[in-house]
A protein has these predicted regions:
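Conserved Class I S-adenosyl-L-methionine
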Residues: 42-48, 68-91
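A short glycine-rich, Lys/Arg-flanked "PGG" loop and its adjoining helix->strand segment in the class I
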Residues: 37-56
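S-adenosyl-L-methionine
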Residues: 1-22
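Conserved class I S-adenosyl-L-methionine
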Residues: 29-34, 56-77
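SAM/dcSAM-binding transferase cores
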Residues: 78-141
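Compact, Lys/Arg-rich rRNA/RNP-binding cores from ribosome-related proteins
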Residues: 20, 39-40, 63
Length: 141
């Protein structure tokens, strides 16, 4: 589906999706754009309306900031974190094989630049209104 993310709820019914993959999104590193992060409270609230009860969200990124922010979102909302890895190519034992099996164009570029690629896998609560964390690192933006 190619659409604006704000319209995603109109494409899926309740419990229709088992897994969401967010690969190399814009980390929205400007202070006034924090609400645009695809792993932020507003978007997780949207995803929770169509993700199945055992469904998962996967985040693969080169942005340490986004990785740490998303871990704070998980913590403040008391979500179940299934996998958290700061460098998937340095410690592959705890990373599912499908995470490293395919490399996006961005991933290949970031690896060539020596940037570590991070990965998170977590479960959402259904029909839940998510909270935004008080993420101190955002104050430095």
């Amino acid at each position: 589906i190619r659409t604006r993310i704000e319209f995603i709820n109109s494409f899926f019914a309740k419990d229709e999706i088992d897994e969401i993959w967010i690969t190399f999104p814009d980390p929205q590193l400007k202070k006034n754009r924090v609400k645009k992060r695809l792993t932020g409270a507003e978007f997780l609230t949207m995803y929770s309306k169509f993700l199945s009860p055992e469904g998962t969200v996967n985040l693969k990124t080169d942005s340490q900031h986004l990785h740490l922010y998303t871990r704070e979102v998980i913590k403040v909302n008391e979500l179940r974190e299934l996998v958290a890895n700061n460098n998937i190519y340095a410690t592959t034992s705890e990373v599912p094989s499908e995470v490293t099996a395919l490399k996006t164009t961005y991933e290949a570029r970031y690896l060539a630049e020596g940037k570590p690629i991070t990965y998170l896998k977590f479960q959402l609560k259904q029909d839940f209104t998510y909270l935004s964390p008080d993420f101190a690192a955002d104050d430095e933006l």
